C-alpha cells in the first residue's frame, strides 16, 4: 500500500501529460534521427523533476487541499505519508532528475528543468497561487518547460523552435487552466484561491479564454511558417485550434457554464496531444536560428 501512496503523491496523471509534450519536443528536434538512450534518459529525467514538483506542491497545499472537494482525499491531507518524509522524497526525486538531465543530455536541459521547477514550486505554489490573479499566467511558464527541455536535450541550444514551443505550450495552459477554474469554481472560492473566474467573474474569463486560444492558434502555425514542422502538422494545428475556438465562442451562449467548461477542458487535452503527435512525425530538416547557446 505504501508504494501506491508514494506514487499517488507524485500525481502520475500530470507526469504522463507532461511526457507526451516532452516526446513531441524531443522528436521534433531529432528530425527522424533518434538517439534512444538520450530519449529514455530525457523522459526519465523530466518525469523525476515533475514528480518532485508535484510532491512539493502537495506538501505546500495541504491546508487548502483539505477544503477543496477535488483534493480532500490526497495522501498528505489524509496523513498517509509523514510531511517531513515527503519533503525528503521530493528532494531526492528532483536532484536525481536534474542530475540525469545534466549527465545524459546537457547543461541547458538541466537549467530549463531547474527554472521550470523554481517557477512551479517557489513562485507559483508558495506565493502566486494564493495571492495573485496572475498565478495561472506564471504557472503556465513552468507547464511549458517539459517540451522545451525535450527539444533542447537534442539541440543543446535555445533557438527559435524552442521559443515557439514555449509560446505554444504557455498559451495552451491558460484556457486549459481557466476551464478547470470555471467547473471547479466553488472549490477555488471555498479555498480562497484568487483565480480569474472567482476574482473577475466567469464572463470576463470567457473573454480571456477566447483571446488566449486566438494567440495559441497563431503560435501553433509559427512552427510550420518558421520551417520546423510540415504541412500535415499545419493542417491538424489549424483544425484543432479552430474547433477549440468554436467551443470557446459557444461558451457565450452556454446555459450551464460548468458543463461547457468541462468540455472545453477535455478538448484542450485532445488538442495538445494532437499537436505533440504531429510535431513528432511531421518535422522539417531546418537550419535553426540560434538565440541562446549553451555547450551541453
Curated annotation (Swiss-Prot):
The keyword Transmembrane applies. One of its GO terms (cellular component) is plasma membrane. It holds the Pfam family UbiA. The keyword Transferase applies. Pathway: Porphyrin-containing compound metabolism; heme O biosynthesis; heme O from protoheme: step 1/1. Keywords: Cell inner membrane, Cell membrane, Heme biosynthesis, Membrane, Transferase, Transmembrane, Transmembrane helix. CDD domains: PT_UbiA_Cox10. Its main location: membrane. It is found in: Cell inner membrane. Converts heme B (protoheme IX) to heme O by substitution of the vinyl group on carbon 2 of heme B porphyrin ring with a hydroxyethyl farnesyl side group. PANTHER family: PROTOHEME IX FARNESYLTRANSFERASE, MITOCHONDRIAL. Belongs to the UbiA prenyltransferase family. Protoheme IX farnesyltransferase subfamily. This is Protoheme IX farnesyltransferase. The lineage of its organism: Bacteria, Pseudomonadati, Pseudomonadota, Gammaproteobacteria, Enterobacterales. The gene is cyoE.
Amino acid at each position: 500500500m505504501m508504494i501506491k501512496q508514494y506514487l499517488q503523491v507524485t500525481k502520475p496523471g500530470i507526469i504522463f501529460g507532461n511526457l507526451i509534450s516532452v516526446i513531441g519536443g524531443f522528436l521534433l528536434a531529432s528530425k527522424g534521427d533518434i538517439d534512444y538512450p538520450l530519449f529514455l534518459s530525457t523522459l526519465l529525467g523530466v518525469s523525476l523533476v515533475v514528480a518532485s514538483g508535484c510532491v512539493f506542491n502537495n506538501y505546500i497545499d495541504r491546508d487548502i487541499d483539505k477544503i477543496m472537494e477535488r483534493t480532500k482525499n490526497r495522501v498528505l491531507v489524509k496523513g498517509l505519508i509523514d510531511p517531513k518524509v515527503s519533503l525528503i522524497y521530493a528532494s531526492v526525486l528532483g536532484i536525481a532528475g536534474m542530475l540525469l538531465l545534466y549527465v545524459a543530455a546537457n547543461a541547458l536541459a538541466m537549467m530549463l528543468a531547474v527554472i521550470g521547477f523554481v517557477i512551479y514550486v517557489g513562485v507559483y505554489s508558495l506565493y502566486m497561487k494564493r495571492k495573485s490573479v496572475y498565478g495561472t499566467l506564471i504557472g503556465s511558464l513552468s507547464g511549458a518547460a517539459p517540451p522545451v527541455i525535450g527539444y533542447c536535450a537534442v539541440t543543446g541550444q535555445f533557438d527559435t523552435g524552442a521559443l515557439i514551443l514555449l509560446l505554444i505550450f504557455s498559451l495552451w495552459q491558460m484556457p486549459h487552466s481557466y476551464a478547470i477554474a470555471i467547473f471547479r469554481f466553488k472549490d477555488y472560492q471555498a479555498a480562497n484561491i484568487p483565480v480569474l473566474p472567482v476574482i473577475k467573474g466567469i464572463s470576463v474569463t470567457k473573454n480571456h479564454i477566447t483571446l488566449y486560444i486566438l494567440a495559441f492558434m497563431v503560435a501553433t502555425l509559427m512552427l510550420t511558417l518558421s520551417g520546423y514542422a510540415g504541412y500535415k502538422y499545419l493542417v491538424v494545428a489549424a483544425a484543432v485550434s479552430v474547433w477549440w475556438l468554436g467551443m470557446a465562442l459557444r461558451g457565450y451562449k452556454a446555459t450551464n457554464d460548468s458543463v461547457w467548461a468541462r468540455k472545453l477542458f477535455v478538448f484542450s487535452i485532445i488538442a495538445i496531444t494532437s499537436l505533440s503527435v504531429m510535431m513528432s512525425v511531421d518535422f522539417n530538416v531546418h537550419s535553426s536560428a540560434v538565440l541562446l547557446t549553451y555547450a551541453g
